[in-house]
Amino acid sequence: MLSTLQPPRSLSLLPLRRFQISKTIVSAASSKTIDTSVISPPQSQILTTRRSLLSGETTAVEIAKSYLSRIRLTEPQLKCFLHVSENVLKDAQEIDQRIAKGEELGPLAGVLIGVKDNICTQGMPSTAASRILEHYRPPFDATAVKKIKELGGIVVGKTNMDEFGMGSTTEASAFQVTANPWDLSRVPGGSSGGSAAAVAARQCMVSLGSDTGGSVRQPASFCGVVGLKPTYGRVSRFGLMAYASSLDVIGCFGSTVADAGMLLHAISGYDRFDSTSSKQDVPEFQSQFLSVDHFESKPLNGVKVGIIRETLEDGVDSGVRSATQEAASHLEALGCILTEVSLPSFSLGLPAYYVIASSESSSNLSRYDGVRYGNQVMAEELNKLYECSRGEGFGGEVKMRILMGTYALSAGYYDAYYKRAQQVRTLIRKDFKAALEQNDILISPAAPSAAYKIGEKKDDPLAMYAGDIMTVNVNLAGLPAMVLPCGLVEGGPSGLPVGLQMIGAAFDEEKLLKVGHIFEQTLKGSSFVPPLLANVA
């Protein structure tokens, strides 16, 4: 039961000391980089679908059937989805009927979209991969989902995740463990592992995830897809089950930068149901996605790119470091001006993040008491009902983070933990502001290693937490960031993907998308297809 657990021993390691990446946490990949020059640049699934529908080459129903068939073939191995919608073919048929009538189609018409299970979908299970919400079916759509549907998008199903977004491997799901399409013995990352793996396995065209400390970007790196975390406030959080409200954002996955960018455009904008959503204008991101034929010899001439020094120091796998350096060289060849930048407070970000996120989660998850929210376990006394409902409803990782947060917020430790963590957050924001005043974007690895084995770090939470060191600072600063594949390292049947993280100034996703699209379309080997799909139509 939750009330009988003691504060975890790891709390003694949480004071805001500088965090060094341990060399022992990196074991997935070797230093050799694999040549992928035989692979051609990727094509946008959204644009291809639209062209096929408008030309009459295919129908929305035929497209939907092909994706549902692929789900049936690959899902027993991957376990990306917790629920597949029964309305996919019906929704596709409605799009075909609109085409037959000559009606105008929305930009996402016929696009099959996976939705992370902590994002509410009307009438469909939305459990946050937790037993405490096992049978919950929301009576409303999250704003992001509502916008997708209004533009013709089809929700294909709800994707697996770490319970309430608390984890980096998707092993903390209460229902199943998702496998990485590149190597079924490895994790897809987390907490949005199901959304990333589903896009990588072409079970859906694009998907929604949530990113509190890297939960879109790290699995994008592990699965070889594009993961886009918008600026805090760019996308409404209405209908997103809260983990850490000052950090949570809804993000996008796609097999290309264009797909992720067009999905972001669809869900962005002010929402009166979310007071933290911004009234900033949403640019026409689609203008960035030109054909490769239009690129000049140096299409990024003069773009200033800062390489974050601290992200390439000891503790980063040598293969990841090499892939990042090669990606930087490619940017330079495209005309970028490279400089090395330092974020002095970088190493403080990880402990500060876990104090803040755990503190906010202990407050947010207090609503799940078996009375107001969540499955109820009957007991003779009210306190016992709370204890039993939460004790049986929450998994171990969630309980540990609730305890960490409650401990950090307690009267005797508030100043030592939570207050200091917020002070560090201010320093991190200042570091990024200074770096981005001198550079258009910053780059770093997305994670210290490629995907590791399922179960490898399950019993060592500190090692797992350390893997978030590349991503958490961006959430603390509220900035946009995108991860896209930049190479393969040895491991698995045909190599393991690693991602390059690009970080931009607040509300400047447009620049990230421009640089990322040109990088992707001109990089040899940028079409990353996992071996699982070799024999799947």
Swiss-Prot record:
Belongs to the amidase family. GatA subfamily. One of its GO terms (biological process) is glutaminyl-tRNAGln biosynthesis via transamidation. It comes from the Eukaryota. It is found in: Mitochondrion; Plastid, Chloroplast stroma. Allows the formation of correctly charged Gln-tRNA(Gln) through the transamidation of misacylated Glu-tRNA(Gln) in chloroplasts and mitochondria. The reaction takes place in the presence of glutamine and ATP through an activated gamma-phospho-Glu-tRNA(Gln). GO terms for molecular function: ATP binding; glutaminyl-tRNA synthase (glutamine-hydrolyzing) activity; hydrolase activity, acting on carbon-nitrogen (but not peptide) bonds, in linear amides. The gene is GATA. The active site is at K116, S191, S215. It is an enzyme of class 6 (ligase). InterPro entries: Amidase, Amidase_CS, Amidase_dom, AS_sf, GatA. Keywords: ATP-binding, Chloroplast, Ligase, Mitochondrion, Nucleotide-binding, Plastid, Protein biosynthesis. This is Glutamyl-tRNA(Gln) amidotransferase subunit A, chloroplastic/mitochondrial. SUPFAM superfamilies: Amidase signature (AS) enzymes. Its main location: mitochondrion. It catalyses: L-glutamyl-tRNA(Gln) + L-glutamine + ATP + H2O = L-glutaminyl-tRNA(Gln) + L-glutamate + ADP + phosphate + H(+). Pfam families: Amidase. GO terms for cellular component: chloroplast; chloroplast stroma; glutamyl-tRNA(Gln) amidotransferase complex; mitochondrion. Its EC number is 6.3.5.7. Subunit of the heterotrimeric GatCAB amidotransferase (AdT) complex, composed of A, B and C subunits. It comes from Arabidopsis thaliana (Mouse-ear cress). This protein may be expected to contain an N-terminal transit peptide but none has been predicted.
